[in-house]
Amino acid sequence: MLKIGVQSNFWYDRENPLASFEYIKSCGFDAVDFNIDNYLSTAKLNKEGLQETFFDQSIEEILAYFTPLKEAPEKTGVVISQMHAPFPAYFGGNEEVNEYIRMAMDKCFAVCEYVKCPAIVVHPPGGDTKEEEWENNWDMYQKLIPIIKKYKGVKICLENLFTTRPNRLEEGKLCAAEDQVKLLDTLNEEAGGDYFGFCFDVGHAILLRKNIRDYLVTLGHRVTILHLHDNNGVDDLHMPPYSCLANGRHHVCNWDSLVEGLKEIGYRGVLAFETFRVYSAYPADVRTDALKLIASIGRSWSKRIEGEE
């Protein structure tokens, strides 16, 4: 059985990690996507300038702060399978802020190693042209190579993103699966090892009307982690799978395509759900049941991916 994960937003209590992990385990999950991005607003730094943040603490202080988080998996068996780094992670023309973000990333990677988290999403930057987007991605990620190489068992994951334009959504100019393959392979060649992987966000693929199975098959072994959630094809809703119907009849997303694609590439990572909107969509007294339903969907998919059904 593949592990079933969910992001930490809303249910995680910073003051009591152990109780939080015990709660999410009771909901049927055995993995967590930890939102370390909540500890730094990079957009605020870019807008207002450098200021003191959580990451100005020494690495010793930060690891001490996260010691209860490290102990929670050891006591519950619920692993931290992935993290989400602060984002945006790059601001063109603002090297002062970019340098600060790299310092924060260094400490995020250290936390990953400390809590035995093997993957962290670092959002790729955009650009006005495909060439500019490549240059921005190369500038950001290649500067992270000497940093990530300091930490054992931690991989940086890129993600398929989109940009919101007036009355439309625009795919990231390097988000075609073939372009991601080229970028990932080039980065790993530069790094001299397997330091970069891919986070496939199915919700973003829905918005951009991608053929999910084909996308996954093209990425193949590079698919390291997942962001699983549903939407109506218009808004990035982050709802549980099977929530959205087209014309009240058919699912907006072809979920069979997702399961078949993961099965075809031999995916054996965590089925990680990024479904935080259940906390605003549902009343407080049914949120636990909603989380249990999400975990049940994950177990159903796991059986199909591993060929048990």
Regions found by a protein language model. Name each.
Residues M1-Y114, G193, G197, H221, ...:
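N-terminal pre-domain/capping segments
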Residues G5-Q7, S81, I120-V121, C157, ...:
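Structural detector of well-ordered beta-strand residues that form the stable sheet scaffold
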Residues Q7-W11, N35-Y39, A85-P88, P125-G127, ...:
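Active-site beta-loop-alpha junctions enriched in small/polar residues
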Residues D13-R14, F21, L50-F54, I59, ...:
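Gly/Pro-rich active-site loop or hairpin
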Residues D30, V79, P118, V154, ...:
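Short acidic/polar active-site loop segments enriched in Thr and Asp
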Residues F55-M83, M140-Y151, V181-L187, N254-D256:
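Alpha-helix-loop-beta-strand connector modules within alpha/beta enzyme cores
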